[in-house]
Design a protein with these regions (language model features):
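Acidic, Ser/Thr- and Pro/Gly-rich low-complexity regulatory segments
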Residues: 1-237
Length: 237
C-alpha cells in the first residue's frame, strides 16, 4: 500500500534541532560553529575537525571517566543505543536524513555529551585545565557554539548522563542540578521562581536543548511545563 508523500514528509514528534535552509541565512557565520561541532549537522567538517577544541573532546572524555567508577559507561552506551531512533528523530535536515552508521552516530553522541557535561562541571569547579578560562573571548565562543540551534544534542541525553554522574559519586543533594550547571555556564539568569525550586523540581522541567533553554529564558516562560510565567526578561550574556 502506497503512502501519501505528504505524510512521509511529516516531522517525527521528537524533531527539535533543525538545519537552517541557506535561502534564509543572511550571514552563514551566525549559524555555523567556530570551534567545535555538536551532533550530526556539522559533524566531520574539515574546518572544525582541525580545531583544537575538537581534539579536546578526547581529553574531556578521559577526565570525565576519571571522576566515575562502576558501570556508568556501559549504562550510558546502552541508553544511547536504546534511544538511538529517538535521538536521530530530533534532527531535521534540509533534505534526506542522517547517513552516519549506528556505530559512528552513537560514538558521536557519547563523546559530545561527555564533552558538554565536562565543560559545565569544570566551570562549576572553577578549574583552569586548558579547556576553559584561557581567555574571555574563547569562553564566549564556547558559549556561543553551545547555543547554536544546528549544534545541539537533546537535553534528555545530558540529563541521563548527569543522573549517572551524581548516582555514581553519591552526592545528589550536594551537587547542582543540570539546569543550574547549564544556566551558570551559559550565563542564563534564572528567575526567582526557578531558584527557589528543589533539585527534584528542576529535574521535572522539560527542555529540548540549550537553544530551547535560552529561548525559554528570553521570553520569560521557563518552565513552561509547570505553568509558571515570569514577567522579567532574562539576560544571557
Amino acid at each position: 500500500m502506497m503512502q501519501d508523500s505528504s505524510f512521509q514528509d511529516l516531522e517525527p514528534p521528537e524533531c527539535c534541532i533543525y538545519k537552517i535552509p541557506d535561502k534564509i541565512k543572511r550571514r552563514r557565520e551566525f549559524y555555523t560553529p567556530l570551534l567545535f561541532s555538536i551532533g550530526p549537522l556539522h559533524y566531520g567538517k574539515v574546518e572544525l575537525a582541525a580545531m583544537e577544541m575538537e581534539k579536546q573532546k578526547l581529553r574531556c572524555y578521559d577526565k570525565f571517566c576519571s571522576r566515575l567508577y562502576g558501570t556508568w559507561q556501559e549504562e550510558f552506551k546502552s541508553f544511547i543505543q536504546h534511544h538511538e531512533t529517538r535521538i536521530r528523530n530530533t534532527y531535521r535536515y534540509i533534505s534526506g536524513t542522517c547517513t552516519l552508521s549506528s556505530d559512528v552516530f552513537r560514538k558521536m553522541i557519547l563523546y559530545d555529551s561527555i564533552f558538554i557535561l565536562e565543560i559545565l562541571i569544570s566551570y562549576h569547579e572553577g578549574g583552569n585545565d586548558g579547556i576553559l578560562n584561557q581567555s574571555f573571548l574563547k569562553d564566549y565562543i564556547i558559549r556561543r557554539d553551545l547555543l547554536l540551534l544546528e549544534n545541539q544534542v537533546p537535553y534528555f541525553i545530558l540529563d541521563e548522563l548527569h543522573k549517572l554522574l551524581i548516582a555514581d559519586i553519591g552526592i545528589y543533594y550536594e551537587y547542582p542540578s543540570l539546569l543550574t550547571l547549564s544556566c551558570n555556564f551559559l550565563r542564563i539568569r534564572m528567575p526567582k521562581e526557578i531558584l527557589s525550586m528543589s533539585k527534584k523540581e528542576h529535574d521535572k522541567i522539560k527542555v529540548a536543548h540549550f537553544t530551547d533553554l535560552a529561548r525559554s529564558a528570553l521570553v520569560g516562560i521557563l518552565p513552561r511545563d509547570l505553568g509558571i510565567s515570569s514577567g522579567n526578561f532574562l539576560e544571557i550574556f
